[in-house]
Amino acid sequence: MVNKNILKIRKQLDKLDNKLLDVIKKRSLLVDVVIKNKKFKKDIVDKRRISIILRNISKKSKQKKIDTKITHKIWKSMIKAFIDYEYRNFK
């Protein structure tokens, strides 16, 4: 049986997950606007922008004392997912 402390912490994690979903939804809406402003499918992947984002996330992670391997993997995965989303929704 799982102890009560762990159950409390899991409830907090569930609340955070819901907040993350809200943030992802907001990000998706902004990406929709970006898609509408791109004229060509070849403009979807901006390697320079991706590099800047990952560098900034690494820097901010260090400042906040967050394991940079975690944030790097999360952001790379998110960027890849949103690039896929852009390709699927580009018109």
Residue ranges, per PLM feature:
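Domain-level signature for soluble enzymes in the chorismate/prephenate branch of the shikimate pathway
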Residues: 1-91
